[in-house]
Protein backbone atom coordinates (compact mmCIF):
# COMPACT_ATOMS: atom_id res chain seq x y z
CA UNK A 1 0.00 0.00 0.00
CA UNK A 2 1.43 3.35 -1.08
CA UNK A 3 1.42 6.37 1.21
CA UNK A 4 1.00 9.90 -0.10
CA UNK A 5 4.15 11.99 0.37
CA UNK A 6 4.00 14.49 3.26
CA UNK A 7 4.03 17.45 0.86
CA UNK A 8 0.85 16.23 -0.86
CA UNK A 9 -0.97 16.01 2.45
CA UNK A 10 0.21 19.49 3.42
CA UNK A 11 -0.92 21.00 0.11
CA UNK A 12 -4.30 19.30 0.45
CA UNK A 13 -4.92 20.93 3.82
CA UNK A 14 -3.68 24.31 2.59
CA UNK A 15 -6.11 24.09 -0.34
CA UNK A 16 -9.00 22.87 1.80
CA UNK A 17 -8.37 25.59 4.40
CA UNK A 18 -8.22 28.28 1.71
CA UNK A 19 -11.49 27.12 0.14
CA UNK A 20 -13.17 26.98 3.55
CA UNK A 21 -11.92 30.50 4.38
CA UNK A 22 -13.13 31.93 1.08
CA UNK A 23 -16.50 30.21 1.49
CA UNK A 24 -16.89 31.66 4.99
CA UNK A 25 -15.95 35.14 3.74
CA UNK A 26 -18.43 34.91 0.88
CA UNK A 27 -21.17 33.68 3.22
CA UNK A 28 -20.49 36.48 5.71
CA UNK A 29 -20.47 39.09 2.92
CA UNK A 30 -23.83 37.83 1.65
CA UNK A 31 -25.25 37.83 5.18
CA UNK A 32 -24.04 41.40 5.78
CA UNK A 33 -25.42 42.55 2.43
CA UNK A 34 -28.81 41.02 3.28
CA UNK A 35 -28.72 42.58 6.76
CA UNK A 36 -27.82 46.05 5.48
CA UNK A 37 -29.78 46.33 2.23
CA UNK A 38 -32.80 44.08 2.88
CA UNK A 39 -33.38 44.31 6.65
CA UNK A 40 -31.72 47.60 7.61
CA UNK A 41 -31.78 49.35 10.97
CA UNK A 42 -34.97 51.37 10.68
CA UNK A 43 -35.51 52.15 14.37
CA UNK A 44 -32.13 53.54 15.49
CA UNK A 45 -32.41 57.13 14.28
CA UNK A 46 -35.12 59.15 16.01
CA UNK A 47 -36.06 61.34 18.99
CA UNK A 48 -34.73 58.86 21.56
CA UNK A 49 -31.24 60.07 20.59
CA UNK A 50 -32.25 63.64 21.39
CA UNK A 51 -35.04 66.05 20.50
CA UNK A 52 -33.19 67.93 17.77
CA UNK A 53 -31.44 67.11 14.50
CA UNK A 54 -29.05 69.61 12.92
CA UNK A 55 -28.55 69.59 9.14
CA UNK A 56 -26.01 71.78 7.37
CA UNK A 57 -26.73 72.58 3.73
CA UNK A 58 -30.30 71.55 4.43
CA UNK A 59 -32.20 73.53 1.80
CA UNK A 60 -31.46 71.36 -1.25
CA UNK A 61 -30.68 67.82 -2.34
CA UNK A 62 -29.39 65.26 0.14
CA UNK A 63 -29.41 67.68 3.08
CA UNK A 64 -33.04 68.61 2.55
CA UNK A 65 -33.96 64.92 2.15
CA UNK A 66 -32.24 64.08 5.46
CA UNK A 67 -34.04 66.95 7.19
CA UNK A 68 -37.41 65.72 5.91
CA UNK A 69 -36.70 62.09 6.82
CA UNK A 70 -35.63 63.06 10.35
CA UNK A 71 -38.70 65.28 10.76
CA UNK A 72 -40.87 62.40 9.54
CA UNK A 73 -39.39 60.37 12.42
CA UNK A 74 -40.51 63.03 14.89
CA UNK A 75 -37.31 65.03 15.37
CA UNK A 76 -37.22 68.81 15.61
CA UNK A 77 -35.00 70.29 12.90
CA UNK A 78 -32.32 72.99 12.80
CA UNK A 79 -31.45 73.94 9.23
CA UNK A 80 -28.15 75.74 8.60
CA UNK A 81 -27.52 77.18 5.16
CA UNK A 82 -26.68 80.41 3.33
CA UNK A 83 -29.97 81.77 2.01
CA UNK A 84 -32.49 82.89 4.61
CA UNK A 85 -35.26 82.86 1.99
CA UNK A 86 -34.60 79.21 1.15
CA UNK A 87 -34.27 78.36 4.84
CA UNK A 88 -37.65 79.93 5.55
CA UNK A 89 -39.28 78.07 2.66
CA UNK A 90 -37.90 74.63 3.58
CA UNK A 91 -38.42 75.23 7.29
CA UNK A 92 -42.07 76.17 6.80
CA UNK A 93 -42.67 73.18 4.51
CA UNK A 94 -41.21 70.78 7.08
CA UNK A 95 -43.19 72.39 9.88
CA UNK A 96 -46.47 72.10 7.98
CA UNK A 97 -45.88 68.63 6.55
CA UNK A 98 -44.50 66.89 9.65
CA UNK A 99 -45.83 69.06 12.47
CA UNK A 100 -42.44 69.51 14.15
CA UNK A 101 -40.63 72.56 15.47
CA UNK A 102 -37.94 74.01 13.20
CA UNK A 103 -35.22 76.63 13.53
CA UNK A 104 -32.91 78.21 10.98
CA UNK A 105 -29.41 79.67 11.06
CA UNK A 106 -28.30 81.62 7.98
CA UNK A 107 -24.52 81.55 7.47
CA UNK A 108 -22.10 81.34 4.54
CA UNK A 109 -19.85 78.32 5.13
CA UNK A 110 -17.22 79.71 2.76
CA UNK A 111 -16.37 82.18 5.55
CA UNK A 112 -14.57 81.20 8.74
CA UNK A 113 -16.06 83.71 11.21
CA UNK A 114 -19.53 82.13 11.37
CA UNK A 115 -19.19 79.61 14.17
CA UNK A 116 -20.03 81.89 17.10
CA UNK A 117 -23.39 82.55 15.42
CA UNK A 118 -23.97 78.81 14.97
CA UNK A 119 -22.96 78.16 18.59
CA UNK A 120 -25.50 80.73 19.80
CA UNK A 121 -28.22 79.25 17.58
CA UNK A 122 -27.63 75.73 18.91
CA UNK A 123 -27.25 76.73 22.55
CA UNK A 124 -29.43 74.75 24.96
CA UNK A 125 -30.69 72.25 22.38
CA UNK A 126 -30.65 68.50 23.02
CA UNK A 127 -29.09 67.43 19.72
CA UNK A 128 -29.33 63.73 18.90
CA UNK A 129 -28.37 63.76 15.21
CA UNK A 130 -25.94 65.93 13.26
CA UNK A 131 -25.83 65.75 9.47
CA UNK A 132 -22.72 67.48 8.12
CA UNK A 133 -23.95 67.79 4.56
CA UNK A 134 -22.95 71.24 3.30
CA UNK A 135 -20.53 70.97 0.41
CA UNK A 136 -19.38 72.40 -2.90
CA UNK A 137 -17.62 71.02 -5.95
CA UNK A 138 -16.12 72.42 -9.14
CA UNK A 139 -18.24 74.09 -11.78
CA UNK A 140 -16.76 71.49 -14.15
CA UNK A 141 -13.81 69.03 -14.11
CA UNK A 142 -10.56 70.92 -14.68
CA UNK A 143 -6.79 70.60 -14.40
CA UNK A 144 -5.55 71.99 -11.08
CA UNK A 145 -3.67 75.04 -12.40
CA UNK A 146 -6.46 75.91 -14.84
CA UNK A 147 -9.25 76.10 -12.23
CA UNK A 148 -10.85 79.57 -12.50
CA UNK A 149 -10.05 81.82 -9.52
CA UNK A 150 -7.87 79.03 -8.12
CA UNK A 151 -6.77 80.60 -4.82
CA UNK A 152 -10.31 81.54 -3.84
CA UNK A 153 -11.64 78.14 -4.96
CA UNK A 154 -9.07 76.36 -2.77
CA UNK A 155 -10.13 78.41 0.25
CA UNK A 156 -13.85 77.91 -0.38
CA UNK A 157 -13.57 74.16 -0.92
CA UNK A 158 -11.57 73.71 2.29
CA UNK A 159 -13.83 76.00 4.34
CA UNK A 160 -17.06 74.44 3.11
CA UNK A 161 -16.08 70.78 2.75
CA UNK A 162 -13.51 70.39 5.54
CA UNK A 163 -13.61 73.19 8.12
CA UNK A 164 -17.41 73.05 8.46
CA UNK A 165 -17.34 69.34 9.36
CA UNK A 166 -14.72 69.87 12.07
CA UNK A 167 -16.17 73.05 13.54
CA UNK A 168 -19.85 72.05 13.65
CA UNK A 169 -18.88 68.67 15.09
CA UNK A 170 -16.85 70.56 17.70
CA UNK A 171 -20.01 72.44 18.73
CA UNK A 172 -22.38 69.45 18.83
CA UNK A 173 -20.27 66.52 20.04
CA UNK A 174 -19.79 67.63 23.70
CA UNK A 175 -23.54 67.47 24.36
CA UNK A 176 -23.76 64.01 22.81
CA UNK A 177 -20.86 62.76 24.92
CA UNK A 178 -22.45 64.22 28.05
CA UNK A 179 -25.67 62.28 27.34
CA UNK A 180 -23.79 59.18 26.08
CA UNK A 181 -25.76 58.98 22.82
CA UNK A 182 -25.84 60.57 19.41
CA UNK A 183 -25.35 60.03 15.69
CA UNK A 184 -23.13 62.07 13.38
CA UNK A 185 -23.61 61.56 9.64
CA UNK A 186 -20.82 63.11 7.57
CA UNK A 187 -21.66 63.31 3.88
CA UNK A 188 -18.48 62.45 2.01
CA UNK A 189 -18.57 61.12 -1.57
CA UNK A 190 -17.49 58.17 -3.67
CA UNK A 191 -14.90 60.68 -4.92
CA UNK A 192 -13.29 60.28 -1.50
CA UNK A 193 -12.90 56.49 -1.86
CA UNK A 194 -10.52 56.65 -4.81
CA UNK A 195 -8.80 59.73 -6.30
CA UNK A 196 -10.69 61.55 -9.05
CA UNK A 197 -8.36 63.54 -11.33
CA UNK A 198 -9.72 66.86 -12.63
CA UNK A 199 -11.69 67.06 -9.38
CA UNK A 200 -8.48 67.00 -7.36
CA UNK A 201 -9.29 69.37 -4.49
CA UNK A 202 -12.89 68.17 -4.16
CA UNK A 203 -11.80 64.52 -4.12
CA UNK A 204 -9.15 65.26 -1.48
CA UNK A 205 -11.61 67.12 0.76
CA UNK A 206 -14.04 64.21 0.62
CA UNK A 207 -11.25 61.76 1.50
CA UNK A 208 -10.61 63.97 4.54
CA UNK A 209 -14.26 63.71 5.58
CA UNK A 210 -14.08 59.91 5.30
CA UNK A 211 -10.91 59.60 7.39
CA UNK A 212 -12.16 62.14 9.94
CA UNK A 213 -15.38 60.13 10.32
CA UNK A 214 -13.62 56.79 10.75
CA UNK A 215 -11.23 58.17 13.36
CA UNK A 216 -13.96 60.02 15.26
CA UNK A 217 -16.09 56.88 15.42
CA UNK A 218 -13.22 54.88 16.92
CA UNK A 219 -12.53 57.62 19.46
CA UNK A 220 -16.12 58.04 20.65
CA UNK A 221 -17.97 54.76 20.04
CA UNK A 222 -17.32 53.79 23.67
CA UNK A 223 -19.17 56.99 24.66
CA UNK A 224 -22.31 55.90 22.81
CA UNK A 225 -21.67 57.99 19.68
CA UNK A 226 -22.06 56.50 16.19
CA UNK A 227 -20.24 58.33 13.39
CA UNK A 228 -20.89 57.39 9.79
CA UNK A 229 -19.12 58.37 6.58
CA UNK A 230 -21.72 58.49 3.79
CA UNK A 231 -20.06 58.07 0.39
CA UNK A 232 -22.60 58.14 -2.44
CA UNK A 233 -21.93 57.98 -6.14
CA UNK A 234 -24.04 60.31 -8.27
CA UNK A 235 -27.42 61.37 -6.86
CA UNK A 236 -29.93 63.47 -8.81
CA UNK A 237 -29.29 66.83 -7.12
CA UNK A 238 -28.52 70.41 -8.10
CA UNK A 239 -24.90 70.00 -6.94
CA UNK A 240 -24.44 67.00 -9.26
CA UNK A 241 -26.28 68.83 -12.08
CA UNK A 242 -28.55 65.81 -12.61
CA UNK A 243 -32.25 66.54 -12.95
CA UNK A 244 -33.79 63.17 -13.77
CA UNK A 245 -33.30 60.21 -11.37
CA UNK A 246 -32.28 56.82 -12.76
CA UNK A 247 -31.59 53.42 -11.21
CA UNK A 248 -27.92 54.27 -10.59
CA UNK A 249 -28.56 57.98 -9.94
CA UNK A 250 -31.45 57.98 -7.45
CA UNK A 251 -33.35 61.01 -6.23
CA UNK A 252 -32.13 62.50 -2.96
CA UNK A 253 -35.26 61.20 -1.22
CA UNK A 254 -34.75 57.63 -2.46
CA UNK A 255 -31.09 57.76 -1.50
CA UNK A 256 -31.71 59.03 2.04
CA UNK A 257 -34.48 56.49 2.73
CA UNK A 258 -31.94 53.80 1.88
CA UNK A 259 -28.91 55.38 3.58
CA UNK A 260 -30.55 56.09 6.93
CA UNK A 261 -31.29 52.37 7.39
CA UNK A 262 -27.53 51.67 7.37
CA UNK A 263 -26.90 53.77 10.50
CA UNK A 264 -25.61 51.48 13.23
CA UNK A 265 -24.72 48.79 10.69
CA UNK A 266 -22.00 50.46 8.62
CA UNK A 267 -19.53 53.15 9.67
CA UNK A 268 -18.70 53.67 5.98
CA UNK A 269 -21.57 53.37 3.53
CA UNK A 270 -22.37 54.22 -0.06
CA UNK A 271 -25.93 54.45 1.22
CA UNK A 272 -27.56 52.73 -1.74
CA UNK A 273 -27.33 49.14 -2.95
CA UNK A 274 -26.47 49.98 -6.58
CA UNK A 275 -23.74 52.34 -5.37
CA UNK A 276 -22.42 49.56 -3.13
CA UNK A 277 -22.07 47.29 -6.16
CA UNK A 278 -20.31 50.08 -8.07
CA UNK A 279 -17.92 50.57 -5.16
CA UNK A 280 -17.13 46.85 -5.04
CA UNK A 281 -16.29 46.82 -8.75
CA UNK A 282 -14.04 49.87 -8.42
CA UNK A 283 -12.25 48.41 -5.40
CA UNK A 284 -11.15 45.27 -7.25
CA UNK A 285 -10.29 47.02 -10.52
CA UNK A 286 -6.54 47.40 -11.23
CA UNK A 287 -5.51 50.95 -10.34
CA UNK A 288 -4.13 51.71 -13.82
CA UNK A 289 -7.45 50.67 -15.36
CA UNK A 290 -9.44 52.74 -12.86
CA UNK A 291 -7.38 55.87 -13.60
CA UNK A 292 -7.67 55.34 -17.35
CA UNK A 293 -11.47 55.10 -17.12
CA UNK A 294 -11.98 57.94 -14.63
CA UNK A 295 -9.55 60.27 -16.42
CA UNK A 296 -11.32 59.62 -19.71
CA UNK A 297 -14.69 60.29 -18.08
CA UNK A 298 -13.46 63.52 -16.44
CA UNK A 299 -11.91 64.75 -19.70
CA UNK A 300 -15.15 64.01 -21.54
CA UNK A 301 -17.18 66.06 -19.04
CA UNK A 302 -14.63 68.88 -19.22
CA UNK A 303 -14.65 69.02 -23.02
CA UNK A 304 -18.44 68.92 -23.15
CA UNK A 305 -18.69 71.83 -20.69
CA UNK A 306 -16.09 73.96 -22.48
CA UNK A 307 -17.74 73.39 -25.89
CA UNK A 308 -21.11 74.38 -24.48
CA UNK A 309 -19.65 77.49 -22.85
CA UNK A 310 -17.92 78.46 -26.10
CA UNK A 311 -21.22 78.22 -28.01
CA UNK A 312 -22.94 80.43 -25.46
From Swiss-Prot:
Keywords: Endoplasmic reticulum, Lipid biosynthesis, Lipid metabolism, Membrane, NADP, Oxidoreductase, Steroid biosynthesis, Transmembrane, Transmembrane helix. Pfam families: adh_short (PF00106). InterPro entries: NAD(P)-bd_dom_sf (IPR036291), Sc_DH/Rdtase_CS (IPR020904), SDR_fam (IPR002347), VLCFA-Steroid_DH (IPR051019). One of its GO terms (biological process) is positive regulation of cell-substrate adhesion. It is a multi-pass membrane protein. The keyword Oxidoreductase applies. It catalyses: a very-long-chain (3R)-3-hydroxyacyl-CoA + NADP(+) = a very-long-chain 3-oxoacyl-CoA + NADPH + H(+); 17beta-estradiol + NAD(+) = estrone + NADH + H(+); 17beta-estradiol + NADP(+) = estrone + NADPH + H(+); 3-oxooctadecanoyl-CoA + NADPH + H(+) = (3R)-hydroxyoctadecanoyl-CoA + NADP(+). It comes from the Eukaryota. A motif (Di-lysine motif) lies at residues 308-312. This is Very-long-chain 3-oxoacyl-CoA reductase. It comes from Mus musculus. The gene is Hsd17b12.
